[in-house]
Amino acid sequence: MQLGLDFGRVEALVAGVDEVGRGPLCGAVVTAAVILDPERPILGLNDSKKLSEARREALSEEIREKALAWCIARAEVEEIDRLNILHATMLAMRRAVEGLAVTPRLALIDGNRCPKLAVPCAPVIKGDAQVPAIAAASILAKVARDREMLVLDALYPGYGLARHKGYPTAVHLEALARLGPTPIHRRSFAPVRELLDVVSIPCAPTS
């Protein structure tokens, strides 16, 4: 699809859309949609994974202040388990775009596929490193989800959620095996599902 856009500059009424949290074993998948204001530039936008936590936090506040419109949305653990992670992510992206206070003329989606939207959309592979609005969306989503994981870490101590943010690190997998899944763990993900299968195996009767 020929978009006729200069990815290095802010385009009027173009929404960037990105997600954070497809890979973790627990918690919601969080998405964001952002329409930047060409008259109010934000310096230093980049893929959220390439920025320090302090820089992400500062940019998140600047994006909220300067963007023409922004919306953070989500799909909950129950939706992920019911729909699968791909469809839940598409649902959360749609919610983010539909939640914008300004209707975009085009939505650019990070990745290789688009959700079903009422506005024209196009996927952009590695868009968070190419399109400023997608980079802004990745920052909002990352900061929002990381903050949620700090809250969940306090609610479910022992899993190290504040450190690894729910991703399947060795520390998380060890804690999961030792403590068992919590209500925020995704039952449809193999490491969690396999643990539940082991727990549900009935013991052999003793003679």
From Swiss-Prot:
Example of a GO biological process term: DNA replication, removal of RNA primer
InterPro entries: RNase_HII, RNase_HII/HIII, RNase_HII/HIII_dom, RNaseH-like_sf, RNaseH_sf
Keyword Protein biosynthesis found: no
Broad EC category: hydrolase
Cofactor: Mn(2+); Mg(2+)
Catalytic activity, EC: 3.1.26.4
GO molecular function, one term: manganese ion binding
Chain ranges passing through the membrane: none
PROSITE patterns cross-referenced by the UniProt entry: RNASE_H_2
Gene3D superfamilies: Ribonuclease H-like superfamily/Ribonuclease H
Ranges for domain RNase H type-2: 12-201
Catalytic activity: Endonucleolytic cleavage to 5'-phosphomonoester
Keyword S-adenosyl-L-methionine assigned: no
Localization per Swiss-Prot or TrEMBL: Cytoplasm
Keywords tagged on the record: Cytoplasm, Endonuclease, Hydrolase, Manganese, Metal-binding, Nuclease
Binding locations of a divalent metal cation: 18-19, 110
One Gene Ontology CC term in the entry: ribonuclease H2 complex
Cofactor: how and how many bound: Manganese or magnesium. Binds 1 divalent metal ion per monomer in the absence of substrate. May bind a second metal ion after substrate binding.
HAMAP family the record matches: RNase_HII_B (MF_00052_B)
General function of this protein: Endonuclease that specifically degrades the RNA of RNA-DNA hybrids.
Family label: Belongs to the RNase HII family.
NCBIfam families: PRK00015.1-1, PRK00015.1-3, PRK00015.1-4
Protein's UniProt name: Ribonuclease HII
Gene name, Swiss-Prot/TrEMBL: rnhB
